[in-house]
């Protein structure tokens, strides 16, 4: 694996200089390249300059006693019926209360996983489309890492994941962990799996992202109780949900 793939943001400025010295095949492709480079530079700048985004591992210390199960990437399973979903939601709510955690609600528009990741990484859930774009890039560039977990033609899978509103899964979570060099921590509604850690391949994580995962249906962004009331933490009311809770 080369250096660019290990850290896709480290050479953002180098990529910008290279794109300026290479003639584009068309105006549209050149514009697309510039836009991609601008996105990369923005992401790199946000991650580098705002140490508060990492929250100094406070949630990690709070839940350090929990045992995490080994993570195996997978696509989404069958969605539960409303009765099972209700029970799962109650179980998740109880766990969050026990751990002293609160959810920042994400819109249920099919982008909730990417919104939650964007909120954790950039404190802006509206940056979800850029998170999705980089996750899809990771899936394409490092196909060998993920292909065995996808039970369909891989090109079809990546084309599907590129679309706005397509639900993320545990394969995209692994790709996000790898792309952003992050440990992704899930507090779940699973009866036998309350906590899952997703670590980047062959590298130490530089940051953490804490998400709640409810019943194969929905992801939210997690904070310690009381943090969401602070003035520097964004709050939002989701416009749409998949479930009436």
UniProtKB/Swiss-Prot annotation:
It holds the Pfam family OTU. The active site is at residues 109, 112, 218. Gene3D superfamilies: 3.90.70.80. Its EC number is 3.4.19.12. Keywords: Hydrolase, Ubl conjugation pathway. One of its GO terms (molecular function) is cysteine-type deubiquitinase activity. Residues 10-35 have a biased composition (Low complexity). The keyword Hydrolase applies. The keyword Signal does not apply. InterPro entries: OTU_dom, Papain-like_cys_pep_sf, Peptidase_C85-like. Signal peptide: none annotated. Residues 101-225 form the OTU domain. Residues 1-37 are annotated as: Disordered. It catalyses: Thiol-dependent hydrolysis of ester, thioester, amide, peptide and isopeptide bonds formed by the C-terminal Gly of ubiquitin (a 76-residue protein attached to proteins as an intracellular targeting signal). PANTHER family: OTU DOMAIN CONTAINING PROTEIN, OVARIAN TUMOR DOMAIN-CONTAINING DEUBIQUITINATING ENZYME 11. Hydrolase that can remove conjugated ubiquitin from proteins in vitro and may therefore play an important regulatory role at the level of protein turnover by preventing degradation. Inactive cysteine protease. Belongs to the peptidase C85 family. This is OVARIAN TUMOR DOMAIN-containing deubiquitinating enzyme 11. It comes from Arabidopsis thaliana (Mouse-ear cress). The gene is OTU11.
């Amino acid at each position: 694996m080369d250096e660019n793939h290990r850290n896709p943001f480290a050479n953002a400025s180098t990529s910008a200089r290279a794109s300026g010295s290479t003639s584009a095949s068309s105006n549209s492709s050149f514009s697309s390249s510039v836009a991609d480079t601008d996105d990369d530079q923005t992401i790199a700048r946000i991650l580098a300059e705002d140490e508060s985004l990492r929250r100094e591992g406070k949630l990690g210390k709070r839940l350090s006693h929990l045992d995490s199960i080994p993570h195996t990437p997978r696509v989404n399973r069958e969605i539960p019926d409303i009765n099972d979903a209700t029970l799962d939601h109650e179980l998740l709510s109880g766990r969050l209360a026990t751990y002293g955690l609160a959810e920042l609600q994400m819109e249920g528009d099919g982008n909730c996983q990417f919104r939650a990741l964007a909120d954790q990484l950039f404190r802006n859930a509206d940056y979800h489309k850029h998170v999705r774009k980089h996750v899809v890039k990771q899936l394409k560039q490092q196909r060998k890492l993920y292909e065995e977990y996808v039970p369909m033609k891989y090109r079809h899978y990546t084309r599907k994941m590129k679309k706005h509103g397509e639900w993320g899964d545990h394969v995209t979570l692994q790709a996000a962990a790898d792309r952003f060099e992050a440990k992704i921590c899930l507090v779940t509604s699973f009866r036998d799996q309350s906590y899952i850690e997703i670590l980047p391949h062959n590298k130490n994580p530089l940051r953490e992202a804490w998400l709640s995962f409810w019943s194969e249906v929905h992801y939210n962004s997690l904070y310690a109780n009381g943090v969401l009331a602070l003035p520097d933490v964004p709050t939002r009311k989701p416009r749409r949900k998949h479930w009436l809770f």
